[in-house]
Amino acid sequence: MLRLGSHVSMSGKKMLLGASEEAASYGSNTFMIYTGAPQNTRRKPIEELNIEAGLEHMKAHDMDDIVVHAPYIINIGNSVKPETFELGVNFLQSEIERTRALGAKQIVLHPGAHVGEGADKGIKQIIQGLNEALIHDQDVQIALETMAGKGSECGRTFEELAQIIDGVTHNELLSVTFDTCHTHDAGYDIVNDFDGVLNEFDKIIGIDRLKVLHINDSKNERGAHKDRHANIGFGHIGFDALHYVVHHPQLANVPKILETPYVGEDKASKKAPYKWEIAMLKNGEFDPDLLNKIQNS
């Protein structure tokens, strides 16, 4: 079954219920949330996340397999500032608890940045952080994200992700989030040879670890190492390639999450594109006038 949705907001009093309602309004059957603002570590207690009402709404709308995204502020690749590393480990442990309470099985994590110390040192630090954060009997997996290679990011190649996975003691608790924009920006040819890229992923990491897909177009050419998302069909990856990924038979049961930009010039009146992009990916026909339609809706 095609599992297709987007990033949605979990905020206010409704929390999980509000997230599920937003996802349903887009025609989604899965979604991704941050448990609070992605740029900080302030979080509500689990009992204020309105989980019961949210799960009821999800069940009524045939939504499951939701995904949590850890905040950007976590950097367990930092070997320069011990306090940043410790904050990352401790916060990751508390995020695992929140993810479990929400009924999600995957928590997406940007592996970390080496902050100028070199990839090998960064990867070693990430391994240490994951070994400290993971508890062998937890039922939540950390889904390490494929990165674009911007700045000092680790995880820009399948080999780097495999190195992290191999170094972690309880690596059965690790999975991978495959981001189409990041992978394209890192230099992989998902436009002309997605099957070849997937085979390479399978050989180096193992396709059974691919548990989340982020479906994004890219504002940059392949290999740019930039990480700037574009709306579906309006970037350098293009609609046909992304439609192929979304409907790939080997990835049928993997939740596919859109993180494309809101549409509009004015920040106050920007509109979420997800209802339209999801419909377009389902029906298989690219609409070159889509952005105008969203703006005028």
Swiss-Prot record:
User: Which residues of the sequence carry a binding annotation for Zn(2+) 1?
Assistant: H69, H110, E145
- A Pfam family that this protein carries is AP_endonuc_2
InterPro entries xrefs: AP_endonuc_2, AP_endonuc_F2_Zn_BS, Xyl_isomerase-like_sf, Xyl_isomerase-like_TIM-brl
Q: Could you say which enzyme class this protein belongs to?
A: hydrolase
Q: Where does Zn(2+) 3 bind?
A: H182, D227, H229
Cofactor (UniProt): Zn(2+)
Q: What is its EC number?
A: 3.1.21.2
Keywords linked to the UniProt accession: DNA damage, DNA repair, Endonuclease, Hydrolase, Metal-binding, Nuclease, Zinc
Instruction: Give the reaction(s) catalysed.
Output: Endonucleolytic cleavage to 5'-phosphooligonucleotide end-products
Q: How is the cofactor bound?
A: Binds 3 Zn(2+) ions.
Q: Which GO terms describe its biological process?
A: base-excision repair
Q: Where does Zn(2+) 2 bind?
A: E145, D179, H214, E259
**What terms describe the molecular function in GO for this protein?**
deoxyribonuclease IV (phage-T4-induced) activity; DNA binding; DNA-(apurinic or apyrimidinic site) endonuclease activity; phosphoric diester hydrolase activity; zinc ion binding
Recorded hits in SMART domains, A to Z, give: AP2Ec
Q: Does the keyword Transferase apply?
A: no
Family that this chain belongs to: Belongs to the AP endonuclease 2 family.
HAMAP family from the UniProt entry: Nfo
Q: What is this protein called?
A: Probable endonuclease 4
Q: Which organism is it from?
A: Listeria welshimeri serovar 6b (strain ATCC 35897 / DSM 20650 / CCUG 15529 / CIP 8149 / NCTC 11857 / SLCC 5334 / V8)
